[in-house]
Amino acid sequence: IPEASFYWFEDDVLCKCRPDIICKPQGPHQDYEIVVVDYKTTYSCSPESFKESVLKYGYAEQAAWYRRGMEAAGYKVKEFVFVAQEKKPPFASKVFKITNEQMDVAWLTMEEHLHAYMRHLKGEKPTVYNSPNVVTLDLDVQD
């Protein structure tokens, strides 16, 4: 299923996810199991480079968000994979996946962001505004 939108409520907040592709495994008793595929363009498909992109852009948290949306729709996400393709010739591509343990950590981070957003909607200012105006940075400078 390409680019289907899924909507659900978290308390009173309307939420949405739109995975690039949803694949349903073939076989009995697998009607609600799915594999979610997310397409990403990148400058390099090397594992080290794509890992940096995953960390920099929060792709793991996005995967957790999509999983949450799919579960709200009644599906069980069997696997989440990224199809990464380079932006320049030869347009190399590679498939990456995150482990269940990594997904669990991303899920917790995503939940923190969601709850912070819900608190913001109720009028609470983000914690960055509740901190001192002057913060001393501890820079680890090597000689």
Regions found by a protein language model. Give the residues of each.
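A short acidic/basic microdomain associated with nuclease active sites
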Residues: 1-11
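Conserved beta-strand scaffold positions in the cores of enzyme catalytic domains, especially
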Residues: 2, 36, 80-82
